[in-house]
């Protein structure tokens, strides 16, 4: 899980979602998981 000021989709499988008011990227590839904060 990377915590970054701006989250971006890295590949085609990445999805940007909102969870508990946080913007997150979820993906099949665990290296692509990101959270904004």
Swiss-Prot record:
Family: Belongs to the bacterial ribosomal protein bL36 family.
Domain of life: Bacteria
Name of the protein in its database record: Large ribosomal subunit protein bL36A
A Pfam family that the UniProt record links to this protein: Ribosomal_L36
A GO molecular function held by the record: structural constituent of ribosome
PANTHER family to which the protein is assigned, alphabetical: 50S RIBOSOMAL PROTEIN L36, CHLOROPLASTIC, LARGE RIBOSOMAL SUBUNIT PROTEIN BL36C
Record GO cellular component, one term: ribonucleoprotein complex
NCBIfam families assigned: rpmJ_bact
Alphabetical keyword list: Ribonucleoprotein, Ribosomal protein
PROSITE patterns assigned to the protein according to its UniProt record, in alphabetical order: RIBOSOMAL_L36 (PS00828)
Biological process according to GO: translation
């Amino acid at each position: 899980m990377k915590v970054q000021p701006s989250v971006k989709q890295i590949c085609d499988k990445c999805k940007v979602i909102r969870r508990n008011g946080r913007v997150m990227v979820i993906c099949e590839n665990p290296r692509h998981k990101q959270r904004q904060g």
